[in-house]
Structures are given as structure tokens and as C-alpha cells.
Regions:
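Short, Lys/Arg-enriched, Trp-marked, Pro/Gly-tolerant hinge/linker segments that flank
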Residues: 125, 148-156, 169-180
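Generic protein-terminus/edge-of-domain signal
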Residues: 1-64
Length: 180
């Protein structure tokens, strides 16, 4: 099992350059860890668009990802990959350390995003339109990471993350309505 204690360790193992010590966007198409289980010591948000053999494991059950699915992990949680020990073929991993939230509005609101405590069987399934919106949020975060770090970086990054999480709240509510 891989145990990523820092965003830097995660980037190094997954072959990504660290642009900010507390937050990273990792394109899963370019990442191939050698272990099938990863423990994240920071927040992790996975957008899974394509998995080997159309399945991926969250917890102990496998799920069909016909369009896209999101999984949310709090610091200390474990993600179990597919039975082939690979990350999804297409998607993104947003990694952000709790220290990023210090002195930002997200620090006070992170507890309101209750889906971080959902069982992995309650992953968020997205429509094509929703996937496009979430991908845009990831791209905005990635674009901000390309700027040199300054006194505004943490605030801007945390606001982009908060916007992403607000969209996820909306989509979860839609999912609950349509599943009834």
C-alpha cells in the first residue's frame, strides 16, 4: 500500500511536477502507481471517466462508470484501485492538504460537504453536461497552479475548490432526487 503523507509525495510517485506544496491536479491518464491501494493523508477528489474493463473499486465493491463518477476522500482514507492495480485510464485527481484551507472560507465550510463522509458505494455519478462542468473546474484549478505562488494563491485555489464542491453538492442532490 502506498501512503501519501504530502501532496509532493503523491506528485512524485505519480510522475507529476509539484507546482504548489498543498494542492495538485493529476491527470490520471499519465499516472501509473505500482501499488493497488493508496492511502491519502490529505483530501482527495477523484473524477473517474474511464476505468480498465469499465470498472473500478471503491471500498470492496466494483462499479460501472458508464460516463463519469466522483469519489471523495478525507485525510487518512484508502482508495482501492481496480483488480488490475491501475488507476482509471481517464480522469483527474485533485489533492489538497488541509493546511491550504487555513484562513480561507473553505476552512469553515468543508464540514458542510457531507459527501466526504459517504460510503464509497455512494459515489457521485455524473451526466455528460455535469462532467464537462466538473472538468472545467479542474482546469481552472490547474490554470491557477501554473501561476507563481503569491499571497493570493491559497485564497484563489480554495475558492476554485469550493466552487467545485458546490457543484458536487448540486449534483448529489440531483442524484438523490432521481434515485427515488
Amino acid at each position: 500500500m502506498l501512503d501519501f503523507k504530502t501532496v509532493y509525495e503523491c506528485n512524485r510517485c505519480l510522475g507529476c511536477k509539484t507546482l504548489h506544496p498543498q494542492v495538485s491536479i493529476i491527470n490520471l491518464a499519465d499516472s501509473r502507481p505500482e501499488q493497488d491501494t493508496i492511502k491519502f493523508e490529505f483530501y482527495a477528489v477523484l473524477l473517474i471517466e474511464e476505468c480498465p474493463n469499465n470498472c473500478c473499486c471503491c471500498g470492496r465493491k466494483y462499479y460501472d462508470y458508464s460516463n463519469a463518477t466522483m469519489v471523495f476522500l478525507t485525510p487518512g482514507e484508502i482508495f482501492q484501485m481496480s483488480e488490475n492495480n491501475t488507476l482509471p485510464n481517464k480522469g483527474y485527481l485533485l489533492a489538497f492538504h488541509p493546511d491550504l484551507l487555513f484562513q480561507t472560507s473553505l476552512k469553515n465550510h468543508i464540514k458542510n460537504y457531507t459527501f466526504f463522509s459517504y460510503r464509497k458505494e455512494e459515489a457521485l455519478h455524473l451526466s455528460q453536461r455535469e462532467t464537462a462542468q466538473i472538468t472545467c473546474c479542474f482546469e481552472n484549478i490547474e490554470d491557477e497552479l501554473q501561476h507563481p505562488i503569491d499571497t493570493h494563491s491559497s485564497t484563489i485555489l480554495s475558492r476554485y475548490i469550493e466552487l467545485l464542491l458546490d457543484y458536487c453538492t448540486r449534483y448529489y442532490e440531483r442524484q438523490f432526487i432521481t434515485s427515488d
